[in-house]
Amino acid sequence: RSLVGSEMCIRDRKNIVRKEIPMGSKTLVLETGKIARQATASVIASMGGTVVMCAVVTKPSAEGRDFFPLSVHYMEKTYAAGKIPGGYFKREGKPTEIETLTSRLIDRPLRPLFPDFYVDEVQVNCMLLSLDKDNPPDVVALMAASAAMSIADVPFRGPMAAARVGFINDEYVLNPSFAEMDESDLDMVVAGSESAVLMVESDANELSEDLMIGAILYGHQEMKPVIKQIDEFAKEVLPEKSDFTNPNEEEEKKIFSEVSEQCTAGLSEAFTTTDKKERGEKISSVKEALLDGLDEELHNSYLKQFKEVEKHIVRENILGAQKRIDGRDLTEVRNISVETNFLPSVHGSALFTRGETQAIVTATLGSGRDIQTCLLYTSDAADDWFC
């Protein structure tokens, strides 16, 4: 019995692929084949004592689907930092604010790397398994997601990588620790492919535009070697991917030509109408005329190309006539008005209007008893900032 178990263990080890990738003064470790084997692809990424597992699962598209159902979920487990959830509830509940924001952080650079024709369902699940006090998990999660997507048999035009950039003592710092971030004038996360920056997220003190642009370029330059290493890792795991091509390419070109011929004149007139409501009515009229007489099963195909024609006309107007939809030139700002004390019994209120967009904004003052506190994973203190 033990011999069989040993043979299974040896066989399992043969399927494990591990790669160590230098990144500045730190090392990113990618490993696959050990955990979550039933997923389409899974990767465990670690940097120091911070470990994130990412599992990607795909499902064939439903008939008639015309959008890409990609969902990204990032989850933090309190055991990762050796802590127990505080308060009345001792189990993890709904996603925290940081989990939601990190999920979006991962989603934004992944989504543009899929072709428009790909509509299979894709779920990306990242879970923080271990956390040290030197390596924030969001960048590690981004790398894990990129690596997992790269070894999945999907038309992912990656890989991509990410880097955190700090600015301490007039110098850029790559992937600063939590302690270094407390001293930094900049907390920027940059993600991108080898050829382009795909996402930038930052908090900063007052820094010049040149310093901010320099931070983006610095982060992108530092991640390029990592992208090549992730690509090598992916090719070792999955030497060849399936040949993904758009099966409806010729048909879509034909429909686009038909829609363009029928709708360009009406849409061009609509996009010179400055009133938003009237413009919407004209666009709806053109759309109804297009769909009139078509079989219902063709509606989605024609509506998709209708959107493409809309984008083409708006783009041509901006580049050619240097005018936006509402008649403004490219440097003109909408009319702005502000009315304060908009609500009589509220501590502070304002009505902000810009063009046809409005916002009612309120402020309420409270005492120290009203502060929201939450347990920090990285220290024994409680944070009085929103979490």
Name these PLM-found stretches:
Residues 1-10, 377-387:
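Single conserved hydrophobic/aromatic residue that forms the stacking wall/gate
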Residues 13-59, 64, 245-376:
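Extended amphipathic alpha-helical scaffolds
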Residues 16-24, 29-31, 127, 132-137, ...:
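Conserved mixed alpha/beta core segments that line enzyme active sites in large multi-domain catalysts
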Residues 16-17, 40, 67, 93-115, ...:
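Alpha/propeptide regions of enzymes that mature by internal proteolysis
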Residues 33, 39-42, 123, 158-162, ...:
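Gly/Lys-enriched N-terminal cap/neck module of very large, oligomeric protein machines
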Residues 39-123, 128-135, 194, 201, ...:
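Glycine-rich, flexible beta-strand/loop modules in the N-terminal catalytic cores of phosphate-handling
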Residues 77, 111, 115, 150-154, ...:
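Generic secondary-structure signature for well-ordered alpha-helical cores
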Residues 155-267:
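Mobile "lid/hinge" segments at catalytic clefts and subdomain interfaces of large enzymes
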